[in-house]
């Protein structure tokens, strides 16, 4: 769903693409803020299997209705057809051309670093809790800081992308993530968990927006769907490899 949403937004918006993408990702980040605490509370009153059943039924019942009412009045058109002023003439790259471009390889490796490493951290968080002697709910509580940082960064990133372009922001994207890993290595206090996950949230906020806007800036939007499909597949592989 996130792939479809970000691709559609990248095609539809031009001059305000950064802000539009940051708004689109707001829902996911909000869920990341609310769901960990909600699930922990739910586990105290019911079995985890029942929780999955409730979530599945809720999605089946409400997602089609919500989707229908949100998009029924929207006429989606591509960047080439909408009324925004196009400031630059970008070559429309096909996916077969993109994979031969050295810039794609360099940028993709930069973007894949965080999902690769962070997924490993999230999957083995119980080991981190044990190794650090943190409380049982320390990381779950820290995920709220992660989500807040991610949401705030989304809107900052959207503004900065529209002002400075994605290419100029890419080099800064993983710096907070690097600092978070250093905190994880060298600090033992439970408080450090909040800084650790908060900084990951900052990088995540940048990555969510840059992961779509960068490709649109570099390669145009005519074939952005197939390009995003490739990068999303690489991201999924990197998360599996990270574990």
PLM region spans:
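Paired small-residue
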Residues: 191-199
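Extracytoplasmic gate region of multi-pass secondary transporters
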Residues: 96-155
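A late C-terminal transmembrane helix in Major Facilitator Superfamily
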Residues: 23, 32, 218-243
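Flexible cytoplasmic inter-helical loops of multi-pass small-molecule transporters
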Residues: 71-93
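Helix-to-loop junctions at the C-terminal end of transmembrane segments
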Residues: 153-165
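Structural signature of the two symmetry-related core transmembrane helices
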Residues: 168-183
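Helix-loop-helix hairpin linking two adjacent transmembrane segments in secondary transporters
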Residues: 24, 28-75
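Cytoplasmic helix-loop-helix junction between adjacent transmembrane helices
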Residues: 1-26, 220
């Amino acid at each position: 769903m996130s792939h479809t949403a970000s691709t559609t937004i990248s095609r539809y918006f031009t001059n305000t693409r950064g802000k539009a993408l940051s708004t689109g990702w707001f829902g996911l980040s909000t869920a990341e803020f609310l769901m960990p605490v909600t699930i922990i509370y739910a586990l105290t009153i019911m079995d985890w299997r029942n929780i999955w059943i409730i979530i599945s039924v809720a999605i089946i019942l409400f997602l089609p209705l919500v989707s229908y009412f949100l998009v029924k009045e929207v006429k989606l058109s591509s960047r080439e057809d909408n009324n925004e002023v196009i400031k630059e003439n970008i070559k429309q790259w096909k996916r077969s051309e993109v994979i031969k471009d050295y810039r794609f390889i360099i940028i993709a490796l930069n973007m894949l670093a965080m999902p690769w490493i962070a997924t490993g951290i999230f999957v083995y968080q119980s080991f981190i809790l044990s190794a650090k002697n943190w409380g049982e709910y320390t990381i779950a509580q820290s995920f709220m800081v992660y989500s807040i940082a991610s949401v705030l960064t989304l809107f900052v990133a959207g503004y900065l992308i529209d002002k400075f372009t994605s290419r100029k922001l890419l080099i800064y994207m993983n710096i907070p993530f690097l600092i978070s890993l250093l905190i994880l290595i060298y600090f033992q206090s439970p408080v450090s968990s909040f800084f650790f996950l908060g900084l990951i949230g900052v990088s995540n906020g940048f990555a969510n927006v840059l992961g779509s806007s960068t490709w649109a800036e570099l390669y145009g939007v005519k074939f952005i769907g197939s390009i995003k499909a490739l990068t999303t597949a690489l991201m999924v592989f990197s998360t599996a490899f990270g574990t």
